[in-house]
């Protein structure tokens, strides 16, 4: 049914005509998410009529039908203006039972009406900055969190819970003030951690089900997304013991999340949200990933249960198969694994054994191949600076931040970016809490070590001598041509001669020489003025 015909039916004021038209329109457009521009004015007219009835009060027996029509029209970004008035948003909040006003909805609201209203609010908040502002000013987050807090005591339909959480996610994703309000004033981390525990159905023994059902998976992912939003910028610093205990408890739940599968094909997506949130936890709280007691079926290394680390490594390998949005795909899990390896020697040694096993193939470039090491080394020269930074940092930590070891496994050419950023081009080792791990060389590596090109990280075939057969005069002529070309490139600033500063940073050759001379003068007692 066309929107013009529906608008004309609404204008008749006859209930049976209106209901027939709305039901027909709703059924026809239940799955419509794109709309014909030619009918845009008709849809706006219909939206204004619906808003007029919405603000005056929907007929109690047909609220769901009216709200379904509002929901369909709220998908059209060109028809949002009528719905984004303060009165309209307040009316929808009342029907969703999340308004602060009194007496708008009965004590036991119709859950179908609540659900449709929540869907309308989600559409409006997603697409309209005005709706986002009005929702924040109306403090809808307060009533939403109150209802979320009742999930343990009262039974709510899955869809109502899901859209409660979806609306929370949208508000916290789009409004900084709502994020801060939920984190600080409403104690959102505690509330949502408790809700996550309830959703995962963790038993008193601390064991969730082996397979998370579909509905629980959907709700858990929304909870994880809201928690990610409110912790993103809030807990980067030191936390007190009470907060640390809360984040460790959240960490144990996230540990469960990365260890279980979900019904359907959403396991990797579910694990991704859990890993993203792990990256927001205080670093000292990540120790919960290694506190599982070893058991018969667990992966044990140096007396520590490595099941979670192995699960994260498997997740990383899956994400490395993706070719788009690598930053969002691999950076979070690499960051978590890096911090675990940095702080816990057993985790570092286990990961090194899996990612950087003793070198045997010394004739292939480190970035060539399908082993995990090869894929990570390839990322070290990725166009996205964040991707190459986290990949290099992970491998560097697995090498106990030893420059020679790092170059051995990645090649100097691949390692140069991180070494330059760290001021380690001249070698050395940064300060770190690392024991002197042994790095066992294979017989193949020992035999070929002297022939390995440190830049490429492999044994290179000896190239033919390009000057073979030339006279000394010809060699001198070619050398002068090369000097002239370099001089021209340098004068035109196409290239710039570089040198190593005393602090290990790449800098212009002139600056490097000046710094070196200054350092020599400052350390020479005879250079003091008379």
From Swiss-Prot:
It is found in: Cytoplasm, Cell cortex; Cytoplasm. The modification Phosphoserine is found at residues 435, 501, 522-523, 527. One of its GO terms (biological process) is G protein-coupled receptor signaling pathway. Coiled coil: none annotated. SUPFAM superfamilies: ARM repeat. Phosphorylated at Ser-435 and Thr-440 by CK2, stabilizing its interface with G alpha proteins. The modification Phosphothreonine is found at residues 440, 442. Keywords: Chaperone, Cytoplasm, Guanine-nucleotide releasing factor, Phosphoprotein. One of its GO terms (cellular component) is cytoplasm. Its main location: cytoplasm. InterPro entries: ARM-like (IPR011989), ARM-type_fold (IPR016024), Chaperone_Ric-8_A/B (IPR008376), Gua_nucleotide_exch_fac_Ric8 (IPR019318). Signal peptide: none annotated. It comes from the Eukaryota. One of its GO terms (molecular function) is protein folding chaperone. Belongs to the synembryn family. Chaperone that specifically binds and folds nascent G alpha proteins prior to G protein heterotrimer formation, promoting their stability and activity: folds GNAI1, GNAO1, GNA13 and GNAQ. Does not fold G(s) G-alpha proteins GNAS nor GNAL. Also acts as a guanine nucleotide exchange factor (GEF) for G alpha proteins by stimulating exchange of bound GDP for free GTP. Interacts with GDP-bound G alpha proteins GNAI1, GNAO1 and GNAQ, and with GNA13 with lower affinity. Does not interact with G-alpha proteins when they are in complex with subunits beta and gamma. Interacts (via C-terminus) with RGS14; the interaction stimulates the dissociation of the complex between RGS14 and the active GTP-bound form of GNAI1. Interacts with NCS1; interaction is favored in the absence of Ca(2+) and myristoylation of NCS1 is not required. This is Chaperone Ric-8A. It comes from Macaca fascicularis (Crab-eating macaque). The lineage of its organism: Eukaryota, Metazoa, Chordata, Craniata, Vertebrata.
